[in-house]
Amino acid sequence: MDFNQVKVINHPLIQHKLTIMRKKETSTVKFRTLMHEVSMLLAYEVTRDLEIEYEEIETPLATMQSPVLKGKKLVFVSILRAGNGLLDGMLQLVPTARIGHIGLYRDPKTLEAVEYYFKLPEHTQDRDVIVVDPMLATGNSAIAAVKEVKALHPKSIKFLCLLAAPEGISNFHGEHPDVPIFTAAIDEQLNDHGYIVPGLGDAGDRLYGTKLAH
């Protein structure tokens, strides 16, 4: 597997919070809070290479050339529903970002992604886009979502998740070798139900307090 396009974010705070999220006894409220906190930290890393330019400003003491973000506003694209759990923290860091949603569910028999909703901001072309979903398991949902985003010709695309499985990384980069993956951890494997092991369960169910269904 080629990991040149995979960035594992090993920040101690992220890893500590992720450990608590993994624990089966962690409550929905705590899980949701941690998701918010971790998403802010992940957003800091995934936006590290944004372009800047300089503008002249006046401080109380002098005039100076100071850096600001260059170009159009970012677009965050959430893969529903669990992707929404990452948005609040990211928006706290980048409040001017535009938001898109792609609704996909995983067919329980085939594990293929089925689209039921698609709405992205106007003028997504020429913008930097970050597609978010907590789990990169089989990779099918991420593959489908990024394909839709590519059709709009953005300036760049990144994929951000909490956990990734080796199978998901391989499948994703088999279809989108040009799109970098940012993740907090790469786990061992998928089980027969397509869940990441050891993982943290179903991120959407744990985030919204719904029952895990196999």
From Swiss-Prot:
Residues at which uracil binds: I196, G201, D202, A203
Activity regulation: Allosterically activated by GTP.
Cofactor note: Binds 1 Mg(2+) ion per subunit. The magnesium is bound as Mg-PRPP.
Pfam family, one: UPRTase
GO annotation, biological process: UMP salvage; uracil salvage
Pathway info: Pyrimidine metabolism; UMP biosynthesis via salvage pathway; UMP from uracil: step 1/1
Family affiliation: Belongs to the UPRTase family.
UniProt binding sites for 5-phospho-alpha-D-ribose 1-diphosphate: R81, R106, D133, P134, M135, L136, A137, T138, G139, N140, S141, D202
Cofactor(s) needed for function: Mg(2+)
Lineage: Bacteria, Pseudomonadati, Pseudomonadota, Gammaproteobacteria, Legionellales
GO MF terms held by the record: GTP binding; magnesium ion binding; uracil phosphoribosyltransferase activity
Name of the featured protein: Uracil phosphoribosyltransferase
EC code(s) of this entry: 2.4.2.9
Source organism per UniProt: Legionella pneumophila (strain Lens)
Catalyses which reaction(s): UMP + diphosphate = 5-phospho-alpha-D-ribose 1-diphosphate + uracil
Protein role: Catalyzes the conversion of uracil and 5-phospho-alpha-D-ribose 1-diphosphate (PRPP) to UMP and diphosphate.
